[in-house]
Amino acid sequence: MSLDFRNINTLWSSVIVETLHRLGLTTAIICPGSRSTPLAIAFAEHPHITAIPILDERSAAFFALGIAKRTQTPTAMVCTSGTAGANFYPTVIEARESRVPLLIFTADRPPELRHCRAGQAIDQIKLYGNYPNWQTELAIPAPEMGLFRYLRQTIIHGWERSHFPTAGVVHFNCPFREPLAPIIQPEIKELVTNFENNRFFESVKPLQPNLTVPCLSLPPQWLTKKRGIIIAGVAHPKDPELYCQAIANLATFLNYPVLTEALSPVRNFAHLNPNLITTYDLLLRNKELAQNLTPDLVIQIGDFPTSKELRNWLETLEPDHWIIDPSAENSDPLHNKTTYLRLSIESFKLEQSKCIEEKNNKSSWLKTWQIIDQKIREEINLTLESVDFLLEGKVSWLLSQILPPKTPIFIANSMSVRNAEFFWQPNNHQIIPYCNRGANGIDGTLSTALGMAYQAQSSVMLTGDLALIHDTNGFLINPHFRGHLTIILINNNGGGIFEMLPISDFNPLFEAFFATPQNLDFSQLCQTYKIPYQKIRDWPQIEKLLKPLPKAGIRILEVQTDRKKDAVWLKKMLSELAKRVDFRSEELSEN
């Protein structure tokens, strides 16, 4: 037990931290400030919690998010009063939308110093609107055991709310009166006997995992539909292999193709799933193929994929749509005829029955998808193997084949995630992809990736120049970083994703206000933050630098590409590749 009896604020804060430790907290991110002094001391001095000081609140919050994404355990964040907590807001939004557990402790002035121009005091009650799972203001610390019992149980409840019913943010607003520093208040020593023998904390234990509620049988509608598809969307499962195996089991039972997003681990466990389809975005650009492959049933697992082609296709068709999702969220942006199964894919128990046995016969529907997917993949491989110049789209394709097994990779938003969707190859490397696809912003990209990589296996980040520039304060984490992160920087001097949109035809407005080139010398930026830097000259060099990955530190490998040339190449590739596939429409119609 680690309690600090120097004064009422240190005792109050140490009860918070000891309760969190017993619940399972291991990491706290501390931003500097005066009003939060008691909390900072309590976290920093606890022997079993790693407390990391980070200057910039926005970067600190995204770093905490990255840690929580990987561990799927709440990370605590602490800041002082005033605008400090407002800098956590983008992370709160992303955590809510991507279902990541976080605990926020914003220190505050007591009620008598609010709304009276006392300084560094804003209205922090419900600071984050409706985004937290739960939010509360704690009582003013006072030497009463009834209040300490209230504090313990409130922290336990907050921990639970960060997990259930869906993982997310819990916000504790924490008012403190003076003294903020650990100045001795002798009368507090009288409370020591109330905390002896560990009885105060004996009921504080880690949460028990959710009991699995099995689906006793598949919905009968599924067993009668021959032309079904399974969509494996964005997902960060706690056990990637178990998750991928569960999807494979369902797909094998139903003989359905599995259209798999690059931000799902399913593409990286290809040996588990013979029904894997990864080229659906390109396939659906061939309107004849898309028409002939119309499904009568869609089963969605995870969030909807990045692919706009897939969205448009299903929005037009309006098939019966089932979503497997344990949360209470509305996960259907298409507003289809949707039925929800509120459970996890791992919960399915597939019963043997005559109906299923009949379903297990070889499906011509599945075979058609597999043949087309294989042909398109062969075209992709032939095309990219012949590309000898530095091309943005080839980077994802190469990474999917050369990264060491089980490498965590953080893929930035905008073009990085889309190139992965187009070109990330199915493999058996068990690579674990991470992303910020809750709100899809580029803010906090570097900091989140550093959090993902903190005390983890050597990791990789794939990003464009603007996403990295937007979060360069993340490099201030470097002195406290433990682990390794290789940053593969695609520098095309601007927002390449806008080159794919109609606005790209409207110059000079486009270049100044949308592409927004920054003309930054990244080698000089790296010198400022003492980050090792290398400029990539050719493809063999990047492969050599990634096999194996270093064990510690941060480094940047810069791949300079031509934004205009990349966009022309990609537009041509996307429009022509599926059309080159030789597959007769009569065969599709028969299937």
Swiss-Prot record:
Catalytic activity: isochorismate + 2-oxoglutarate + H(+) = 5-enolpyruvoyl-6-hydroxy-2-succinyl-cyclohex-3-ene-1-carboxylate + CO2
Biological processes per GO annotation: menaquinone biosynthetic process; phylloquinone biosynthetic process
Pathway in which the depicted protein is active: Quinol/quinone metabolism; 1,4-dihydroxy-2-naphthoate biosynthesis; 1,4-dihydroxy-2-naphthoate from chorismate: step 2/7; Cofactor biosynthesis; phylloquinone biosynthesis
Bound cofactor: record note: Binds 1 thiamine pyrophosphate per subunit.
Superkingdom of source: Bacteria
Single GO MF descriptor: 2-succinyl-5-enolpyruvyl-6-hydroxy-3-cyclohexene-1-carboxylic-acid synthase activity
Cofactor: Mg(2+); Mn(2+); thiamine diphosphate
Matches recorded under CDD domains: TPP_PYR_MenD, TPP_SHCHC_synthase
Keywords: Magnesium, Manganese, Metal-binding, Thiamine pyrophosphate, Transferase
E.C. designation(s): 2.2.1.9
Gene3D superfamilies in UniProt: 3.40.50.970, TPP-binding domain
Quaternary context: Homodimer.
Reported function: Catalyzes the thiamine diphosphate-dependent decarboxylation of 2-oxoglutarate and the subsequent addition of the resulting succinic semialdehyde-thiamine pyrophosphate anion to isochorismate to yield 2-succinyl-5-enolpyruvyl-6-hydroxy-3-cyclohexene-1-carboxylate (SEPHCHC).
Family, per entry: Belongs to the TPP enzyme family. MenD subfamily.
PANTHER family: 2-SUCCINYL-5-ENOLPYRUVYL-6-HYDROXY-3-CYCLOHEXENE-1-CARBOXYLATE SYNTHASE (PTHR42916), PROTEIN PHYLLO, CHLOROPLASTIC (PTHR42916:SF1)
UniProt protein name: 2-succinyl-5-enolpyruvyl-6-hydroxy-3-cyclohexene-1-carboxylate synthase
Organism listed in the record: Rippkaea orientalis (strain PCC 8801 / RF-1) (Cyanothece sp. (strain PCC 8801))
Taxon lineage: Bacteria, Bacillati, Cyanobacteriota, Cyanophyceae, Oscillatoriophycideae
